[in-house]
Amino acid sequence: MATDEMKSETKKTEHKQKQSTQIKQDLPPPTIPPLPLPYKSCTLKVSIHCEGCKRKVKKILTSIEGVFKVDIDVKQHKVTVIGIISPEILLKKLNKAGKNAEQLPEIPDPVDNKPKPVDPKEKNKKKKKEEKVQITNEATSSGIDNPEKPGSGECDKPESEKPVDEKCLSGDGGETSGPVKEEKKDVLKEKDSGKEESPSPPADSSAPAAEKKAEDTGGAVPDNGKVGKKKKKKGQSLATTNNPTDGPARTQSLPPPTATDYDRPINQINDHHITTTNNPPRHDLYPYPAQGYYAPQVMYGVSYNVAQPPVSVDAASYYTPPPPYSYAYMHNGYQPSDQNPCQPRPSDSFELFSDENPNGCAIM
């Protein structure tokens, strides 16, 4: 019985194999898909006025080998050609047929120009790469800018890690740094003491400026309280400059010059100023004549004669009076020095209007 069952099973399997082989033979062989042709589309601008022009252009383009399809737009004068051919050949054929044609620039498809979506994984990878590059650049730059000095690592270690016998914490270092600090302190003290001892320059310059103005204008020095106070405060400095001897220093303000001081030279106006000047002596605009001499004044007079009238009415006789007497002139002021020959101005104006003075006013 067992042998019969085994025989039946083997027969069934053989039958199944035969059926499968028959099915395979009945199926058609697999077909290979054709390769896509390299078609190109180009747009041309052609002058098309009517349906006849349209037919003529289409006939010319379809007759060329490699042209697959031709589309014509009459309103826009536009022709699109699809095929395996260069646009230069198409333009030559149309120009020979008498049709003006130009090639238009290709408009890119919006679908092709869309940006591709970027995966977040790629973004993370790029960021990590950039961070690594920055870290390496910083490390290289810090190594170049701050090179390690020999022996600096030992001093930079914390106190717990440093050995006891290091030079950074030894007593020798304290001895070397001690005198340097002391020298700096001495220099700072000298600078502070120099600032305290130095007098203020604007206060000293105010007094000579006022005296220079008085000398230039020829007037009296204004008796201001401010100038006097400043001079009193700076009495020691004036005593050292104006009094070369060991005598007492003058701290009082200078009195204003009088009228007689103008005739004296600059060296004698004030006893406080001993310095000599090389400037020429000062003269008045109208110098006075020498003492005891008066220039004769020319007198103008008209002679009127009734018996014998003059030839011309405008004729006039001119005569000069005799030289006047010399009058002694006394002046209580200082005698003029040899350096200034000019005479002082008369203090009293009574003599100018006296009858004895020929230079006086005749009306008075």
From Swiss-Prot:
PROSITE patterns: HMA_2 (PS50846). Keywords: Lipoprotein, Metal-binding, Methylation, Prenylation. Residues 1-12, 111-122, 154-169, 180-198 have a biased composition (Basic and acidic residues). Residues 134-144, 237-253 have a biased composition (Polar residues). Residues 362-364 form a propeptide. It holds the Pfam family HMA. The modification Cysteine methyl ester is found at residue 361. A lipid is attached at residue 361 (S-farnesyl cysteine). This is Heavy metal-associated isoprenylated plant protein 35. It comes from Arabidopsis thaliana (Mouse-ear cress).
